Amino acid sequence: MNPFWQHEELETCHSTQSLAIERVRRGGYQGPFSLSALRQTEGVGQRGNPWVDSGMAVTLSLAWEVQGEESKPDERWPSWISLWVQQALVDYAPELTPVLRLKWPNDLIISNKKLGGVLVSQFAHEGRTFRVAGIGINLAWINPQPETFPSTDLQSVLGRPVDRSQVVQRILEVTAHGLETAKDRDLLDRAVLDLRAPLKSLGDATGK
């Protein structure tokens, strides 16, 4: 896995997002880390809604400390993380380039159907500030699909099996690179606003 993140994969957990926060609060933070689970039992969805489990998904949370100016809350973080996840998916499957889009602020969509999303939270612990990004991507719908919103999955779109470990690996690589090198916040903002912007333009913001 990417050396920036201390990564751990779990068979099952209640929520990678909640577990990441719990670990920091218990004093377990020793640098940026990531948690993924093959199955979540109480995942967190958008606006406090329960996570809808597709049956085969990327459920991944990233946790890192922020200091100085970086510690100021910024509502743009979900969009920035979503852009990096979008780039990672296109790297994994280039044929997604013309169809994978970001619905502001944090939904990844294909043909107006939700493929996944990102949640970002920030909290303080013992005088330090931490940020946690939860990432969920539908890889294959095995369970019944939700009736409340149209959804899709990567396997159906690609028409072939999806390697979950490779998708996770690429997300870790791109997000690590983005967090380490992103300087041009204006460029990231422009990419968020222009849903038709070529994804390769994001490399200019991350030094790729």
Regions found by a protein language model. Give the residues of each.
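Short, acidic (Asp/Glu-rich) active-site segment that either coordinates a divalent metal cofactor
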Residues: 127-158
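N-terminal lobe of the biotin/lipoate ligase/transferase fold
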Residues: 1-98, 116, 124, 161-162, ...
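Short glycine- and Lys/Arg-enriched binding-loop motifs that mark or flank ligand-binding interfaces
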Residues: 39-44, 108, 130-132
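A structural signal for short, well-ordered beta-strand segments
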Residues: 60-62, 106-108, 118-120, 133-139
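Catalytic palm active-site di-aspartate
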Residues: 96-112, 137
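Flexible loop/coil segments at beta-strand boundaries within sensory signal-transduction domains
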Residues: 111, 122-127
